[in-house]
Amino acid sequence: MLPPALNIPKWLEANSHLLQPPVNNYCVYHPSSPATAGYTVMIVGGPNARTDYHINTTPEFFYQYRGSMLLRTVDTSASPPVFQDIPIHEGSLFLLPANTPHCPVRFKDTVGVVMEQPRAEGAVDILRWYCKSCGEIVWEKRFVCTDLGTQVKEVVEEFGADQEKRTCKACGTVAETKYKEGELVQPPRFLE
């Protein structure tokens, strides 16, 4: 028998405490469940202020349920790479192409849904940090993703605990693990 549809407002009422930093997500449909056919569906809350960029070998689908978010992306096909911020407003959706470095910035009292396709066997995810001063890659970690919620947290904490990993080899700037208060401006709640 199939499970019932997930009612987002009721789920949030009972489970919003599960959306904890540094990742702030909860897998409502886990890829290990036979019913999901390998798909991952997460409810993600704000605020989060992580500075890492995730690179996934499959597209990612974003739906912004409450409030607005900022999806920071990097076009690595350009030389030099081009940094682009994409606002995703309440009620809007966005499909991020595979292999696009992205940093989802979520603000206070915002909630979104993210869906990821099944990854190929042995596919490698990457968490990467870029230098704010010169744009070079500061550090990255590659891993086979088996549990996004726990693995991302571990890599973020590993980076944060090691100043050598956080120091840009090109210019010496030490990368922050979080954006500073007021550094990023939340887009308007609705698209005007």
Curated annotation (Swiss-Prot):
This is 3-hydroxyanthranilate 3,4-dioxygenase 1. It catalyses: 3-hydroxyanthranilate + O2 = (2Z,4Z)-2-amino-3-carboxymuconate 6-semialdehyde. InterPro entries: 3hydroanth_dOase, RmlC-like_jellyroll, RmlC_Cupin_sf. Its cofactor is Fe(2+). Substrate binds at residues 60, 106, 116. Belongs to the 3-HAO family. It comes from Aspergillus oryzae (strain ATCC 42149 / RIB 40). Keywords: Cytoplasm, Dioxygenase, Iron, Metal-binding, Oxidoreductase, Pyridine nucleotide biosynthesis. GO terms for biological process: 'de novo' NAD biosynthetic process from L-tryptophan; anthranilate metabolic process; L-tryptophan catabolic process; quinolinate biosynthetic process. A divalent metal cation binds at residues 131, 134, 168, 171. GO terms for cellular component: cytoplasm. Transmembrane segments: none annotated. One of its GO terms (molecular function) is 3-hydroxyanthranilate 3,4-dioxygenase activity. It comes from the Eukaryota. It is found in: Cytoplasm. Catalyzes the oxidative ring opening of 3-hydroxyanthranilate to 2-amino-3-carboxymuconate semialdehyde, which spontaneously cyclizes to quinolinate. Fe cation binds at residues 54, 60, 102. HAMAP family: 3_HAO. O2 binds at residue 50. Its EC number is 1.13.11.6. Pathway: Cofactor biosynthesis; NAD(+) biosynthesis; quinolinate from L-kynurenine: step 3/3.
